[in-house]
């Protein structure tokens, strides 16, 4: 994946900020710091290949350390809303948002209470599909969900299909053999 040097510089600033804040609020596992670029930055950046138009509104739920939301904003997504319930992490996200030239809104609330419209909804290391779909019912997602998932993605799909109708594509992660990107659209709850 080719990344312009200006973006790499901003992502380096983000990395240093995360390392500094991680000592006090545990944004990422210490075990992932040696592979920070692959584990966090590239894992987030790979979503750009599924975003055809950067002039969109993207909502990232359970934003934590800003993956993938802040990374996607730095990479050029025009408007990003980061939803995070933990106030300490929101304070970090506010600082980190200054690295991007694009619009970033920090929302310190539980996801279930948010009513917002967006083109794309993302999350990483958040929860299973049923939980994601349940807690985002008040969020109007016009295009798709882009969800970074691990090895249990098939089980999650099967369980979610019991309560939800949706179309999906499975893309291989470029950073982890067992990782997948689920591209979900046409989501409807089964009554």
Curated annotation (Swiss-Prot):
Keyword list, A-Z: Cytoplasm, Methyltransferase, rRNA processing, S-adenosyl-L-methionine, Transferase
Keyword field contains Manganese: no
GO cellular component: cytosol
UniProt key word Transferase: yes
Catalytic reactions of this protein: guanosine(527) in 16S rRNA + S-adenosyl-L-methionine = N(7)-methylguanosine(527) in 16S rRNA + S-adenosyl-L-homocysteine
Major enzyme class: transferase
InterPro entries, per database record: rRNA_ssu_MeTfrase_G, SAM-dependent_MTases_sf
Coiled-coil ranges (or none): none
Subcellular location: Cytoplasm
Family to which the UniProt record says this protein belongs: Belongs to the methyltransferase superfamily. RNA methyltransferase RsmG family.
Function: Specifically methylates the N7 position of guanine in position 527 of 16S rRNA.
Protein name per UniProt: Ribosomal RNA small subunit methyltransferase G
Gene label: rsmG
């Amino acid at each position: 994946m080719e990344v312009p040097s200006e973006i790499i510089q901003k992502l380096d600033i983000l990395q240093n900020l995360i390392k500094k804040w991680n000592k006090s609020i545990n944004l990422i596992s210490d075990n992932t710091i040696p592979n920070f670029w692959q584990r966090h930055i590239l894992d987030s950046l790979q979503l750009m290949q599924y975003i055809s138009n950067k002039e969109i509104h993207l909502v990232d739920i359970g934003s934590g350390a800003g993956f993938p939301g802040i990374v996607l904003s730095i990479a050029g997504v025009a408007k990003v809303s980061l939803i995070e319930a933990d106030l300490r992490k929101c304070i970090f996200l506010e600082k980190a948002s200054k690295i991007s030239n694009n619009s970033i809104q920090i929302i310190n609330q539980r996801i279930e209470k948010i009513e917002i419209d967006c083109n794309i909804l993302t999350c990483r290391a958040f929860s299973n599909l049923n939980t994601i779909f349940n807690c985002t019912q008040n969020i109007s997602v016009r295009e798709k969900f882009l969800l970074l998932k691990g090895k249990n993605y098939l089980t999650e799909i099967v369980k979610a299909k019991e309560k939800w109708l949706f179309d999906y594509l499975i893309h291989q992660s470029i950073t982890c053999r067992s990782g997948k990107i689920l591209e979900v659209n046409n989501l409807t709850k089964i009554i």
